[in-house]
Swiss-Prot record:
Its main location: cytoplasm. It is an enzyme of class 6 (ligase). Monomer. A motif ('HIGH' region) lies at residues 112-122. It holds the Pfam family Arg_tRNA_synt_N. This is Arginine--tRNA ligase. PANTHER family: ARGININE--TRNA LIGASE, CYTOPLASMIC (PTHR11956:SF5), ARGINYL-TRNA SYNTHETASE (PTHR11956). One of its GO terms (biological process) is arginyl-tRNA aminoacylation. Its EC number is 6.1.1.19.
Amino acid sequence: MHHTIKHLLETTLGFSVVLEKPKDKNHGHYATPAAFSLAKELKKNPALIAQELSKKLSEIEVFESVQSVGGYINFRLKQGFLDAQASLALSQGREFGKGDKQGSILLEYVSANPTGPLHIGHARGAVLGDALSRIGRHLGYALETEYYVNDAGNQIHLLGLSIYLAGRDSLLSLPVTYPEQYYRGEYIVDIAKEALKKWGEKAFADEAFIPELSLFGKELMLEEIRSNLADTHIHFDHYVSEKSLYPRWEETYALLQSHQGCYEGGGKVWLRSSAHGDEKDRVIVRESGEPTYLAGDIIYHADKFARPYDRYINIWGADHHGYIARVKAAIEFLGHDSSKLEVLLSQMVTLLKGGQPYKMSKRAGNFILMRDVLEDIGADALRFIFLSKKPDTHLEFDVDDLNKEDSSNPIFYINYAHARIHTMLGKSSLDSQEIEAASLEGLEDSIFDLLFLSLQLPQVLEDSFENRAIQKVAEYLRALAGEFHKFYNEHKILETPQEAALLKVCKVVALSLSQGLALLGITAKERM
């Protein structure tokens, strides 16, 4: 609907316009500041220009009224037009809000090391990435998702060593000497138990078996990670192994050299990242000749950019903020346009339970596990709360609040609105065809305001995706549910002369609620 109105304005005026929603809904459904952009060019008062434009725009058939206020031009849509838009939305069903955006996007997120279970920080980025992918695809983008598996380097050896030590110490009571760094937690002992079942005591007899334990532990962790993600309604198109890319290091290194992107110094190889906005140059090959963690990321981004997507989006933890400049510098030195890479940062999460800090997992030591919170509040509540705030802001919530059955629990509040509508539809003697064919003529303005709000979903989806502000969808759904509950409490709907018309409005509300929730990866409930 937004695009329809914008097209009508531009066709009538002959130039591009910005279409906004007035801050005060009493001013109308839409507004444009077009007069302000023309004022400088025409050297005239914006208010006078707005008055002149208003006369021209009054000729557009779908406008009930066109008013100029302080240079802004406000429009109110005709009820018949809104009725037609309601019928169109209902005929589209699950296609409602679907776009025809062009362009390909590779979205990489989570990419947690396969050395331990997913914690609640991983979960926030996971949910954000999945919601972005769902909305992006619905808008028409050719979007693919990817998980980068960090299965090379010292952390994988450390995983195998930790399993080896746990097996000797906790299972076989053999003497061990723990190093300063190793992975702790019950999950390590659990993997050691599985290794004991598979290989017997020989798995812990000699350190030569550590590489086998590393591979075994990595595969078990990846299996658990995939399971946690699936239980949160998250699936990836691709899993890319860091280890599988390492044979390409020499050619990647040669490419960096060919673009004067690296140099040797102090027995190390340095990325000349300060030339592209980083605060200093970074080591990519140690004195030992071993590539650094950054080198692995450079190979991965070389692989990414060799696949010709129009845009690349990474979702990283906020602690990786300083990493952006060095990766973008590497992309430039590989001969690619680093502006095609966009990095979104996901901030920390603080969990409470009954007002007290949420207990850390015994299984994983100093972490709150994604699995524990899933079992506490369920995937739908977890997803909604993580999507309710900007990802780059700190999030704190009490899980007990998400188990409440009242308006303080946003996911309950939204689902209750959706379920109320389905309950009414089930009780009504009218069939779907009768309801959808009903005329809305004669309904009061406040009901058309509710209908107008329910028809905003397509634009909310587009704005939220393009601005990477998925919280706007959550805010919209909560606002729509609130307006519906108000309408429900103020109107008798069933067994009235206007039953069909009122239920038609309700069906559009339900469509937007269910569609919006689905694109957040949440199931809308029809019964509660």
